[in-house]
Amino acid sequence: MKKEYWLERWRQEEIGFHQREINPYLSRYWPELQVAPGKRVFVPLCGKSRDMIWLREQNLSVLGVELSPLAVEAFFKENGYSPRHIIGEKFDQWDADGIHLLCGDFFDLKKDHLAQVDAVYDRASLVALPPETRHAYTDHLLCILPPAIRILLITFDYPQAEMSGPPFAVSTAEVEALYGKRTDIRLLAKFDVLTENPRFQQRGISRLQESIFLLMTRTA
């Protein structure tokens, strides 16, 4: 799945993946990470997610990365911010009220970009990626994160043959395969959510689950 695919989705406003409300699992399970106020949270492939507003309201600094400048601009405009905009070589940076968004390719991130990060929130990143890209994504993420980081990960799982993603199906077994060698994985909850998602029913899905994981990167 090429970068142009996502840029075109934003240009055409084909953003059914965007949630207008705060994700309920975020407020319910974020305390499990035990992140102190004032710490910094990284939100990969952040889009214009309002979850970043909730994180900021918890007195956390937010660092997001997003490919589409339209998404970044929309986030600040729709939430009433007047950001400072700094043009860079690999990333343009937008800053306002403790929220810092880097506009560019996730795979161009370096350790220096995430040096001050204390936790990660991934609701829509891993499930946005096709199977052939997920290993590269998780390898790069774990490579550039500081040690001893906690990650709140939310995934979808459904019979992949019944629908072409995104969002793609990511099973518990795949989470363990992607992250198990370098993190400790704890399944916090799993819910059957098909009846709450008619758009998936309309596409012929017979089963839909959401899982919430707490991942803890190992120090060695």
Swiss-Prot record:
It comes from Nitrosospira multiformis (strain ATCC 25196 / NCIMB 11849 / C 71). Transmembrane segments: none annotated. It is an enzyme of class 2 (transferase). One of its GO terms (cellular component) is cytoplasm. Pfam families: TPMT (PF05724). It catalyses: S-adenosyl-L-methionine + a thiopurine = S-adenosyl-L-homocysteine + a thiopurine S-methylether. Its EC number is 2.1.1.67. SUPFAM superfamilies: S-adenosyl-L-methionine-dependent methyltransferases. InterPro entries: SAM-dependent_MTases_sf, Thiopur_S-MeTfrase_Se/Te_detox, Thiopurine_S-MeTrfase, TPMT. GO terms for biological process: methylation; response to metal ion. It is found in: Cytoplasm. GO terms for molecular function: thiopurine S-methyltransferase activity. S-adenosyl-L-methionine binds at W10, L45, E66, R123. Keywords: Cytoplasm, Methyltransferase, S-adenosyl-L-methionine, Transferase. This is Thiopurine S-methyltransferase. It comes from the Bacteria. Belongs to the class I-like SAM-binding methyltransferase superfamily. TPMT family.
